[in-house]
Amino acid sequence: MEIRGLLMGRLRLGRRMVPLGLLGVTALLLILPPFALVQGRHHELNNGAAIGSHQLSAAAGVGLASQSAQSGSLASGVMSSVPAAGASSSSSSSLLSSSAEDDVARITLSKDADAFFTPYIGHGESVRIIDAELGTLEHVHSGATPRRRGLTRRESNSDANDNDPLVVNTDKGRIRGITVDAPSGKKVDVWLGIPYAQPPVGPLRFRHPRPAEKWTGVLNTTTPPNSCVQIVDTVFGDFPGATMWNPNTPLSEDCLYINVVAPRPRPKNAAVMLWIFGGGFYSGTATLDVYDHRALASEENVIVVSLQYRVASLGFLFLGTPEAPGNAGLFDQNLALRWVRDNIHRFGGDPSRVTLFGESAGAVSVSLHLLSALSRDLFQRAILQSGSPTAPWALVSREEATLRALRLAEAVGCPHEPSKLSDAVECLRGKDPHVLVNNEWGTLGICEFPFVPVVDGAFLDETPQRSLASGRFKKTEILTGSNTEEGYYFIIYYLTELLRKEEGVTVTREEFLQAVRELNPYVNGAARQAIVFEYTDWTEPDNPNSNRDALDKMVGDYHFTCNVNEFAQRYAEEGNNVYMYLYTHRSKGNPWPRWTGVMHGDEINYVFGEPLNPTLGYTEDEKDFSRKIMRYWSNFAKTGNPNPNTASSEFPEWPKHTAHGRHYLELGLNTSFVGRGPRLRQCAFWKKYLPQLVAATSNLPGPAPPSEPCESSAFFYRPDLIVLLVSLLTATVRFIQ
């Protein structure tokens, strides 16, 4: 029995309960976008207007696109990806004037408007800045699916000044950006929605990307790009802790674009930080407010780049054929890396100093570029936040990937016989993309996530475990770590009756044991008792807070912390410089209940400097803390070492994480603790002991009747539990040594 099949549970998708596992929390990692602590920001519709106003200035202080309200409807029992109408600020009516003309309305920005508009586009509508200098927008009623209408609509009618620093001559053509204010008032130059690939539509759906075609004239890259087609989280309604991760630009297959933000004055040969968003390979977009690049670029004098890549079946469907080769989303990222290599010097960046950084599935993506021979030479360093290629949710086998693709084909009425793969692909290409993403979960069995990376023989030649064991990966510096409560967010989504989204939630001992039973229905008694034994606080086994927190640790250790540790350990064993952190700060304005602690993704807004935005209510200490995090991250990108040239109380020394010392730095508001691990014993349990136990007890009967591990003297005479204890002690000693 494989370990990934141990912990099973139920997942709530909208109103539908789907069987799911704890070790199969895998599914949740991929349904839900990564999450972080920010304050939700929603704009209300103004007189039904379809234009969303958004100021890239200190006054508005939001990200690359407005955080507009989105809604979805349930289709076939899953969350719909159809966005709702757009939103605008309450003052937009005084800034805009419009005149309707059949299909096109010309909307002109008033000369006295102190705003940069990055429009939200409602379903069936699109808005584009035609000329940044004139401040003119074009509102196009574009039919059922919001999409870019091609490059010509974004070309300027006037010749560009060759001396204009906002006009950059890329290898595909000239582009024009715009200068905006960072939250601190510093200026940055921004280019949004630079095409790096041809739209992957029609016959290009599911295939590896093709480089963008050249264009003539000047392309106005001043509008945030489309988000790739995906489902939208509606489980908690308009709760900002969840909706902050929903896409805030139109959903479209035409989504392969890059964003670049550079400090002003423009640097020469600056370090480049390329962000890869998370979302479980199922969702996500580079334009979220929490990823606002302006503070990081302006405060640390680095070039910040982000990219859109295909997710869900459109990005990771695999049939092993030229038409559906798999890993299209990873090849999107690879093509974007090549674009950065060939063009970033034109923006003031140094192509030899590119650092990839990402969180959750973004961190897994970064790690796969470290492993892939196709990507290793395209960047220098890597930062991995709460993600590792050895996570149980990171990859599936070729056989399983093919089975899931055929299940999807069957669900949408396409040929699904293994002998008719070409027919299946041809049919799937003709389906509406929203139909595909809305039917992916209906094709699955228990505890499975539909479309993730696969060992395809092209991007990946072997499993990450084999690459790490053999030393076949990029030898370089890495910075990596995890947060103290990695599991709570996912547990809240599938144990909704037990862990309600409110203050004061506790878990009794009986509820804890019941939760473990629900999460582990298919394992034998020894394995289940081992998990209960390991995650019980035996000094206070009936403590309701400890029992609640133990559930978080079970999920977080298995899916995140222990895999991050494993990756760091293997890198350190090869003599690479490794820096590890444990993130411990919970923001004052966190919308989630306090008992959720420091959840998966809570570090992201501090990495991007969101607390520096004066409109968001962060404390002065949190602003200073964000400056410290940005400095650590950017120092690493510049030099391979997060430490400043001279140590100080403000920047405590961050020790290397060596194979023997295993040191990490605790990143908290007022702490500078250096620890060892983290969570060495628990990771020995998952990585060393439990696999041995499962192998040793595989012939034992199924799940034993639920009970406390030590509730009677009979415990000491059970052979399976004697094996359990001996194996646990042996594995723990070996792991720590």
Curated annotation (Swiss-Prot):
Q: Which PROSITE patterns match?
A: CARBOXYLESTERASE_B_1, CARBOXYLESTERASE_B_2
Its BP terms in the Gene Ontology are: acetylcholine catabolic process; choline metabolic process
Q: What is its EC number?
A: 3.1.1.7
The region annotated as signal peptide is 1-38
Q: Which cysteines are joined by disulfide bonds?
A: 228-255, 414-427, 562-683
Q: Which InterPro entries match?
A: AB_hydrolase_fold, AChE-related_enzymes, CarbesteraseB, Carboxylesterase_B_AS, Carboxylesterase_B_CS, Cholinesterase
GO CC field: extracellular space; plasma membrane; synapse
**Residues annotated as glycosylated:** 220, 670
What's the domain of life for this entry? Eukaryota
**Compartments reported by the entry:** Synapse
- Keyword check for Disulfide bond, yes or no: yes
The principal localisation class reads other
The active site is formed by 360, 486, 600
Q: Name one GO molecular function term.
A: acetylcholinesterase activity
Give the region (Disordered) as residue ranges: 141-168
Q: Which family does it belong to?
A: Belongs to the type-B carboxylesterase/lipase family.
Role according to the record:
Rapidly hydrolyzes choline released into the synapse.
**Which named protein is this?**
Acetylcholinesterase
- Which species is this UniProt entry from? Anopheles gambiae
